[in-house]
Amino acid sequence: MFASLKLALVYLALGPIAGIIGIPYTLLVGDITRLYRVAMWITNAGVRAAGIKIDISGLENIPAGRSCIFMSNHVSNLDPPVTIPLLPGRSSVLLKKQLMDIPILGRAMRMAKFVPVERGSRRDAAQASVAAAGDALRSGLHILVYPEGTRSPDGRLSTFKKGPFFLALETKAPIVPIAVSGTQTMMRKGSNAIVPGVARIRLLPAIEPSDYATREDLMRAVRNAIAEALPTEMKPADYLTMAL
């Protein structure tokens, strides 16, 4: 409870100040880089204030000078605020389309090239999201996606959606798999309470989409890489048969 309160206090104290000053400045100059850096600093400060320690490895696996698609398992609402500030440069994320309709903030999100997604949307809307993500990659940004599509209900790696792999094959952007563990016990699904602990972030060797003949082969390779890096209790139920 106290950890959640500390995180909330940091965000409530610093977030509005950054927004009041940063968003108008960003809209005026047409460059979101400074606001993004401030937002990442505040995000990281809140995480650490909540008593969350971060153990990260594998940053050397990010291909230099190339826009990447980071693909991570998803076990907690803490995953994005723990992970994104650690990634170099700027990263775009996929978010609910409705958030883009918020006055001023929505415009800033569009400037940041965040990608709007409609859950359960029709085919053309999904294709529009893929196109927007491709545009973000071509502009030099990274993309962070959770190919499971939602948080795992039990902490184990779930099945993957095909959309992110279509994006990877279309753009030929390297995929950097990420294995996240620890956050599933710090903020469980369905709860807002935070329990201090250690979040372990493992960035794995990059996977080149062009090395795979089909989307299914690429998806299998990424899922296998993440599964292999997760602790036993988080490996998928089909782990023993995945490589067969």
Task: Label every PLM stretch briefly.
Residues T43, V115-R119, G149-T150:
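Short, basic, glycine/proline-bearing loop/turn elements
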Residues M1-D55:
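N-terminal membrane-anchoring alpha-helices
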Residues L5, Q127-L244:
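Non-catalytic C-terminal accessory region of glycerolipid acyltransferases
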Residues A18-L35, A49-A50, A64-R122:
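Catalytic core of membrane glycerolipid acyltransferases/transacylases, capturing the structured
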Residues L59-P63:
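Glycine-rich helix-loop-beta junction characteristic of Rossmann-like nucleotide cofactor-binding loops
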Residues A50-S57, A126-Q127, T183-T185:
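Short gly/ser/thr-rich secondary-structure transition/capping motifs
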Residues I56, V115-V117, P209:
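Short acidic-hydrophobic, aromatic-tinged amphipathic segments that line or gate anion-handling sites
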